[in-house]
Amino acid sequence: MKEIKIEELTFNPFDLLKDWALVTSKNQDEFNSMTISWGGFGSLWNKYTATMYIRPQRYTKKLLDNNDYYTISFFDKEYKKELSYLGTISGNDDKNKMSNTKLTPVIEEEIVYYKEAKLVFIFKKEYVNQLTKDGIIDKKVIEQNYQNKDYSYEYIGKIEKVLIKEK
């Protein structure tokens, strides 16, 4: 992987998110990844940022809440099976779920990403807030996505680095 400037990126963010991604966070003893598909890229407080949404019961949320840094990794379509698995199996249920994929973790001091990723964003957490029933204008969203009232948490991270797979 090589580091590039964010201004060098040329992609459609909607296409990128359509193919899912993995958010990964760690603590001193472990790391965990989960699939995400809700989010977006933008700017906040004069910083380049990305937003993602995670339900409160997800194991990765516990790690995110205790670490200021995390990564979001994007993959070629050939890794869809791994992303599907990591989105289905919770770290709450299987602490060894990461070893059941063919992904190779690259573990650095504050972060973890994957050797197989085509694009990795490294983030510093800037803002966290839980969505609320009252804040959701279209009530069909609640019926379709939050029958259990497990409203997602919104995470906004400042993009610290961008890594791209070398060809």
Sequence positions of predicted segments:
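Active-site-proximal mixed secondary-structure blocks
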Residues: 1-167
